[in-house]
From Swiss-Prot:
Miscellaneous field: Present with 2740 molecules/cell in log phase SD medium.
A cellular component annotation (GO) from this entry: Ragulator complex
Modified sites of kind Phosphoserine: S146, S149
Name this protein carries in UniProt: Protein MEH1
Residue stretches of biased makeup (Polar residues): 117-147
Gene name tied to this protein: MEH1
Cystine pairs: none
Role according to the record: Component of the GSE complex, a GTPase complex required for intracellular sorting of GAP1 out of the endosome. Component of the EGO complex, a complex involved in the regulation of microautophagy.
Localization in the cell: Vacuole membrane
Record keywords, A-Z: Autophagy, Coiled coil, Lipoprotein, Membrane, Myristate, Palmitate, Phosphoprotein, Protein transport, Transport, Vacuole
Self-association and partners: Component of the GSE complex composed of GTR1, GTR2, SLM4, MEH1 and LTV1. Component of the EGO complex, at least composed of GTR2, SLM4 and MEH1.
Annotated GO biological process: cellular response to amino acid stimulus; endocytic recycling; microautophagy; positive regulation of MAPK cascade; positive regulation of TOR signaling; protein localization to vacuole; protein transport; regulation of receptor recycling
Length: 184
């Protein structure tokens, strides 16, 4: 019946009305129901696939960010030269004194301050040199000079160095949860 009405109207463009199109498609509205269901299922599958891709992409970004952070930490340590944090040096001196059973800690610190170069570099990386008396002890790094190396034996420095490197290597290991694959 829709075809008859469309012929009478001389193709006036009303063929595209919903009522006429539904009648021409078949008996009732059942003609498009399967198409709508299939289209909805395809859209849901595409949405799930997109969600999986986004989750995998985020996982890969996290892995890359963690790896980059650890590589930056390693490169900072490798490029810094021979620099020991001031508290590490003092702890090594205190430990040596306790092993030798020598004088008190205060005598060691005052003697150590007299023999140190007197310059420290703040951890923020600024190039200004300051004395031990004006710089805070918690955030300073002391350059290792020849009078300092005479106090600390080479064996202790080698142990300290190997402990630091072992800790860096243990912290820089990345355990991936599975094979890194990207579906195309």
């Amino acid at each position: 019946m829709g075809a008859v009405l469309s012929c009478c109207r001389n193709h006036s463009g009303e063929e595209n009305e919903a009522l006429l199109r539904e009648q021409q498609a078949g008996y009732g509205s059942q003609g498009n129901a399967n198409d709508e269901y299939d289209a909805e299922q395809m859209r849901l599958k595409e949405h799930e696939h997109e969600q999986k891709l986004l989750a995998r992409e985020q996982e890969l970004r996290d892995i890359v960010a963690n790896t980059n952070d650890k590589l930056i930490d390693i490169s900072m340590i490798n490029n810094s030269g021979i620099v020991i944090q001031g508290t590490d040096l003092q702890e090594a001196l205190d430990k040596r004194q306790q092993e030798e059973g020598g004088d008190s800690r205060e005598d060691e610190r005052s003697a150590g301050d007299d023999n140190l170069s007197g310059h420290s570099v703040p951890s923020s990386g600024s190039a200004q040199a300051t004395t031990h008396q004006t710089a805070p002890r918690t955030n300073t790094f002391t350059l290792l000079t020849s009078p300092d190396s005479a106090k600390i034996s080479k064996e202790q420095l080698k142990k300290l160095h190997s402990n630091i490197l072992n800790e860096i290597f243990s912290q820089s290991q990345v355990n991936k949860p599975g094979p890194l694959t990207v579906p195309f």
